[in-house]
Amino acid sequence: LHWMVHSFPTRRSSDLNVLDYGAVRHDEAVVHGGSRSQFFEFIAGAEFICGHNIFAHDLKYLEKDFANHGLAEAGIIDTLHFSPLLFPRKPYHHLVKNDKLQSDELNNPLNDAIKCKELLLEELEAFNQLKAGFQDILFLLLHNQHEFSAFFKLLNFSGCENDLHKHISTEFADKICKNADLPEIIRANPVELAYCLALINVFDHDFKESPDQSSITPPWVSRNYPDVEKIMFQLRSQQCADGCSYCNQYLDIHSGLKRWFGYDEFRCYDDKPLQEIAVAAVVKENRSILAVFPTGGGKSITFQLPALMAGENAHALTVVISPLQSLMKDQIDNLEHSHHITCAATINGLLDPIERQKAYERVEEGSASILYISPESLRSRSIERLLLGRNIARFVIDEAHCFSAWGQDFRVDYLFIGEFIKQLQQQKQNRRQI
């Protein structure tokens, strides 16, 4: 090896003093203990220093010491930032869960450093296995970004100097909208675009059969780069006015109806295509709508089809607020038994603890694109945390008369729905209206 990598985490006390240092070098030499001087003597002269979540944590406490020990010019590599780019496909990398490095021992910096080195080497190998075109795209988007530049220097990778807009359009033809404003996205959100493209690379449009349907953006990415959700919407869920090969195929509501439900056309009432009008307003125009249908009139399809298409195209979650647990079960059973659609879940009081945990996991991991809950569930902190970790396509209020009709049976938690959505959007720092 012609480079030096020191992978190190630190353990801190509650008063923010560093208690324990750990590092491993490329030649397998290690250091572990509470001696600051021994630690910096060990890492002296490093060209590159690697850690997991090092920018957000370790550097806060050691950056000044780096400068004092001649390490100001060392390249800093954060394995956390590259994990979603290079292992975007579920089950992701076995050493990473959300933003945490999976380790055999708690509070052992040396063990963490060894795992971090292992992860780095696998990330380098994963990058080398990418198609040359996507390697160039990642380089052109990220090589000038502080959190990413050292990785490419370590690889001595320079990429090509192609027109990035044209390069992405070519590599992702038929995978994103041809008329999305790529030049502006590249200018304003290069990191977010990189995370979106990495995930799109593993999308499989045969959504019903593919195990890749549940590959999603890790919650820490959405939290630190909230515009990822907005950009994914622009690339994959916003139908262009001119029409393009992607939008015509994957945002066409008639082909979606056939693909998901097996129907050739929408149902009409008094010769009016009410179902089609409602679905088009959601999918084509991204509008919030009120749809009033007679009992048994096919109302459910007007929100289920857009939800399934949003799950297919952007792996987004649609939250359906329903007044009755039995109604939730009936709709999920109908999707499964009549249409073989298994990406809907419910979390309600009828579930035993094991069933409830499995439902949470399905939503958290991305294998559910429709979630049925009661209005009371919005008071739950666990539900709030769950939804914060997913890209939310929209909220649906099923049986909307429960929301508007006052009386002795009125459930006051319906009044909280609007406030909850507002708070959720503020917490997600998402500039795209839910």
Q: Where is each model-derived feature located?
A:
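Short, conserved "post-DEAD/DEAH" coupling segment immediately C-terminal to helicase motif II
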Residues: 385-390, 405-432
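Short, small-residue-biased leader/transition segments that mark boundaries at the very start
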Residues: 1-13
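Acidic, Mg2+-coordinating catalytic module of metal-dependent nucleases/exonucleases
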Residues: 95-182, 196
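Conserved SF1/SF2 helicase motif Ia
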Residues: 288, 292, 297, 302-344, ...
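Conserved helix-turn-beta segment of the N-terminal RecA-like "Helicase ATP-binding" lobe
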Residues: 65, 69, 327-353, 358, ...
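Conserved DEDDh/DEDDy metal-dependent 3′-5′ exonuclease domain
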Residues: 25-93, 101-102, 106-127
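Conserved pre-motif I regulatory segment
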Residues: 241-292
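Conserved helix/coil segment N-terminal to the catalytic DExD/H
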Residues: 308, 333, 351-394, 402-408
